[in-house]
Amino acid sequence: MASKIIAGKPDDTEYEIIEGESESALAAGTSPWMNSSTLKLRHRIGRGPFGDVWLATHHQSTEDYDEHHEVAIKMLYPIKEDQRRVVVDKFEDLFSKCQGLENVCLLRGVSSINGKICVVMKFYEGSLGDKMARLKGGKLSLPDVLRYGVDLATGILELHSKGFLILNLKPSNFLLSDNDKAILGDVGIPYLLLSIPLPSSDMTERLGTPNYMAPEQWQPDVRGPMSFETDSWGFGCSIVEMLTGVQPWSGRSADEIYDLVVRKQEKLSIPSSIPPPLENLLRGCFMYDLRSRPSMTDILLVLKSLQNSEEEQVRRGIDSREIRKSSATLGYTEWFLSKDHLQVRDTVRSRKPANSCKHENMDVPEGMVVGLERDSTDPDGFVLVKVHGVHDPLRVHVSVLERVTNGLASGDWVRLKVRKDKRHSPVGVLHSIDREGNVAVGFIGLPTLWKGTSSQLQMAKVYSVGQFVKLKANVVIPRFKWMRKGRGIWATGRISQVLPNGCLEVDFPGMLPFGEEHGSYLADPAEVEIVNFNTCQGAVEKYQHLEDFHWAVRPLLIAMGLLTAMKLGICVRKKIGRSKDGKQRDGSTGQGDCKIPDGKGSDKSKWLVFF
């Protein structure tokens, strides 16, 4: 392919490459589309799941100047004709929104060469991965890690503010400028091509590099959604690699990494020699539930504090937050709680414990914030809440409260009032709701968060770990494979985990594990119903539900029944034996005895005892 493209270009002419970048092509209102005749491919410098990276020369010429610049071209693999316009529009939107971002690679424009869409960007001499490869041990010093980390977190935050996910964070995608500043080299191509059919049907390759992928990236439609905190995982992996010089999950295949990260939920080993605030930050980046990970704003705050030699101050802050987490935040991480800040006149209520279906202690059933004792952004602050029927405001720690807007709060189970797209589940989990009622919801079947308004939602039944569920009677073909009992009856399972999009992981303790059927199953919350002793009608159903708790219940009860029958039989036999012995000694006849002739005219009689 390369030789074919280069063979068709005109002969090279002598020119001088100008150092630096002309801003003329980046002026406001300038179209990002570049004429392919101004681009001359030189040689390929890289290859990835979406296409090849080429070193090229861009020729700009007007009446006032004639310039040539070295550029890097990301040439995408062929895209279907009916999707080309969609892709071009996405990249033009990206181009317009990324102008002026200091920590993101400079985009020059969009073009098409031999029918392939190309993203043209400034050429950088090397990457952070290249620099690490040249160092002894392949790792960076802590000051360098913090410095580069601040640069990169700033760039990621800039792209997040424009609504883009990166999904492919790794040292080889972190470019270095002439003044040794880390630049974000991937502008979120996996995210932009998420719904575009490509030659490769392997979703793993399309959504990032396995060694740096978050759990939800492997199956975003099922274990998603992907959100900004998905990039926190990849960023954490990159920081660990900078500190250790070892690639995450080095030497493992994609299938092995999937088994470790998604199924077994194992986390990367974090160096113990780093400052506690950084260690705590990295542990947060590797939380399985993306809602419990730090946002890029939190990451940038911690890195800047460490970089400015304020480690002791940060340590005190983090430690105090850990105490609050264990005593007052009901199982939520400090990163989860830091994503929303209370303001005066907010409606609030007590926060229910994590993985619980109901509030255990409603100190504040519902009230209004009337005062802030400290800065609202302080995770250890207190607020004054006015509760109906209570004269004086209550002084409550912010970590035990959640903001309520239009009757909804983050973490609530919701259902779409009108389901327009049948491909995704109508039941999901609310991830965020702002004060204007704009919502973001995770649904099975959608790789990213669904955006809408609270008026489109209604409350749904709550599911939590430990509950038993079964498929509804009207479900003929479930979304996911489900266990069956004998005679083809759907089995009842127990929820072992609730994923961020409402997908339920279910195991079947009432079924004896055998072969490939052993392990967890998945369920759509819209297709199941809760089973407990209150919902069971009659003794038979209650006994059947008792068997759902463990496969050993039935054999245990059978064994106990047999043992009881044996003991009863032995007792009866002994009693009969004692009764016979007594009758033979005294020759008396008790009630229920019948005298039967022996049939031979003898005076002797035989006694038959009925028992």
Curated annotation (Swiss-Prot):
Associates with the TOC complex containing, at least, translocons at the chloroplast envelope (e.g. TOCs and TICs such as TOC159, TOC75, TOC33 and TIC56). Belongs to the protein kinase superfamily. Ser/Thr protein kinase family. Coiled coil: none annotated. Residues 39-306 form the Protein kinase domain. The keyword Glycosyltransferase does not apply. Residues 595-606 have a biased composition (Basic and acidic residues). The lineage of its organism: Eukaryota, Viridiplantae, Streptophyta, Embryophyta, Tracheophyta. CDD domains: STKc_PknB_like. SUPFAM superfamilies: Protein kinase-like (PK-like). The keyword ATP-binding applies. ATP binds at I45, G46, R47, G48, P49, F50, G51, D52, V53, K74. The chain crosses the membrane at residues 556-572. InterPro entries: Kinase-like_dom_sf, OCM_Kinase, Prot_kinase_dom, Ser-Thr/Tyr_kinase_cat_dom. PANTHER family: OS06G0639500 PROTEIN. It is an enzyme of class 2 (transferase). It is found in: Plastid, Chloroplast outer membrane. Its EC number is 2.7.11.1. It catalyses: L-seryl-[protein] + ATP = O-phospho-L-seryl-[protein] + ADP + H(+); L-threonyl-[protein] + ATP = O-phospho-L-threonyl-[protein] + ADP + H(+). Residues 573-611 are chloroplast intermembrane. Residues 579-606 are annotated as: Disordered. This is Protein KINASE OF THE OUTER CHLOROPLAST MEMBRANE 1. One of its GO terms (molecular function) is protein serine/threonine kinase activity. One of its GO terms (biological process) is protein targeting to chloroplast. Serine/threonine protein kinase acting as a regulatory component of the plastid protein import machinery by phosphorylating import receptors (e.g. the A-domain of TOC159, TOC120 and TOC132). Supports preprotein import and contributes to efficient chloroplast biogenesis, thus being required for survival during de-etiolation.
